[in-house]
Each structure stands twice: as structure tokens, then as C-alpha cells.
């Protein structure tokens, strides 16, 4: 069972999730200034072995700072079977992280194992049981082949995410500007997430200085249907948010669709029509999504 608060948070907008290296004291202290939808403190790959304990303490204190109270906080912990995994979980659950990001998720059992530990810690520290969300990162061919069972493994899951660097290395290839080598993985992640009714998140774009390349990749994953993307540089936030914002033309059309649907409902009509054409449920739902994105992001700047 999950808490009512987590159930409400599962569908919140997460276009951008900004990685914050846990050992970078300046970023851990000041990342609340960035307008990302979620801040993702990292205790795993970006932290050197000798800095693991220090990073954990810094993130623990940051999670409790009042300036982070109104920001969704996600923490990528080290694998549960590593020497740091359990201590990471103790710190971030007790610290009040909204979501724990599980790295290198290969099976549903990986999710169940960390869920069991989180529940134990919630009960021990007096936190509401079921209030800590989970985000499973899939980073291997094995994980991709089991994406559906992973996505359905726990009610705590708010989404699943693609981690491309390890995945591409295991494929014995490298990342390309076109992203051809990631298409199967991206589609697998997306289909699995949607089958479970949760969100899907794309991998990072690591060349922070290549704005055109970032926008090309972001437009591609948005068209596929991803809810958002992990980011490594604050400069990518506004670029991504603008890309997810609808155009004025899209907003105008969506408003007409919703107005037609509301008029039909008031009149007790079973069929919605606009300009002589029938409008079905999925089109109406899409129109409402466009309007909600416009309310959040404004109109796209071309």
C-alpha cells in the first residue's frame, strides 16, 4: 500500500529532473535556485569512492533544509547490495526524500528488495509508511527485456527511466546523434511504463555545450511520448521546458475542443462535434493535456 500523498504525487509534471552531484557542496547547497521540476541528488556514479560518506551526509542535511521543502527531491542511491546501499537508504528516507532512484534495475526483485528496506526504515523513523516513491532506472539489455515486469513491480513506482551509457556499452556500440541504437530501449521503456500507468523518463544528454544536439534529442523523445528527461546541466532546463510547451495554434485548437466537450456535457449529448467532425475521448484528453502544459510552461517560443 502507498500513502495518499504519494498517490497524489505520482502524476505530477516531471519534464526535467536535474542531477545534483552529492559530493559537490556548492550545488547541493544552492540547487534550489534552478527551475527544474525535480532535483535529483546523486550518491552513485558522480561520487568518488572516498567521498561517498561525505556526500551522503550533505544530501541528508540538504533534504531537511526549508528551501527544498516545496521542490520534489529525488535521490539516486547506490545499489542495495553495495557497501553503501543500506546507509544511503537510511539517510535519504529519514531525511525526507520524496523519491528514491534505484540504479541498474535488472529485475522486478530488485524493486521489491529496495521497497522492503524502505518500508522498514519508514516504520523505524516514524515516517508515514508508503510515502516514499520509487523510480527505477533500467540500464542494461537484461533490464530492457524485463521492463514490463519491473514497471509493474511496486505501487511505489512513479516511473521508470532509461540509463543509456551502461546500456550502450553492453550493446558493444556507442551513442550517435540520431540515437538509432537507443530506439528499441526507449520504446520498451515507454510501453512498459504506459502499461503500468506510470511515467517514462529519458536518459541524459551529456554534451552540455551542444544545444542543437540536445534539442534534437529532446524533440525526438517528446514525440515518442516520454514525460521528461534527466538533465546534467541547469542550462538545459529552460530549453526542455520550452520544447514541452505547446504552440499558440495548439492551444487555440485545444481550447475549442474542450469547450465543445463541455458544451456537449451540459446539453446531455453523447457525441462531441467540432466544425462538423466528431471528437472522441482521446482527442479531448489530449486537448486537456495541451492546456495544462500551457498553464505550466506558457506558449512555446519558436
Curated annotation (Swiss-Prot):
Comment on bound cofactor: Binds 1 Mg(2+) ion per subunit.
Keywords: Cytoplasm, Lyase, Magnesium, Metal-binding
Name of the featured protein: Citrate lyase subunit beta
Protein function: Represents a citryl-ACP lyase.
Compartment list: Cytoplasm
Positions bound to substrate: 76, 139
Family: Belongs to the HpcH/HpaI aldolase family. Citrate lyase beta subunit subfamily.
GO CC term (a single one): ATP-independent citrate lyase complex
Binding site for Mg(2+): 139, 166
Cofactor: Mg(2+)
Species lineage: Bacteria, Pseudomonadati, Pseudomonadota, Gammaproteobacteria, Enterobacterales
Assembly mode: Oligomer with a subunit composition of (alpha,beta,gamma)6.
Pfam families in UniProt: HpcH_HpaI (PF03328)
Induction comment: Repressed by H-NS. Part of the citCDEFXG operon.
Catalytic activity line of the entry: citrate = oxaloacetate + acetate; (3S)-citryl-CoA = oxaloacetate + acetyl-CoA
Listed SUPFAM superfamilies: Phosphoenolpyruvate/pyruvate domain
Chief place of localization: cytoplasm
BP terms from Gene Ontology: acetyl-CoA metabolic process; citrate metabolic process; oxaloacetate metabolic process
Primary enzyme class: lyase
Assigned EC number: 4.1.3.6, 4.1.3.34
Superkingdom of origin: Bacteria
Molecular function per GO: citrate (pro-3S)-lyase activity; citryl-CoA lyase activity; magnesium ion binding
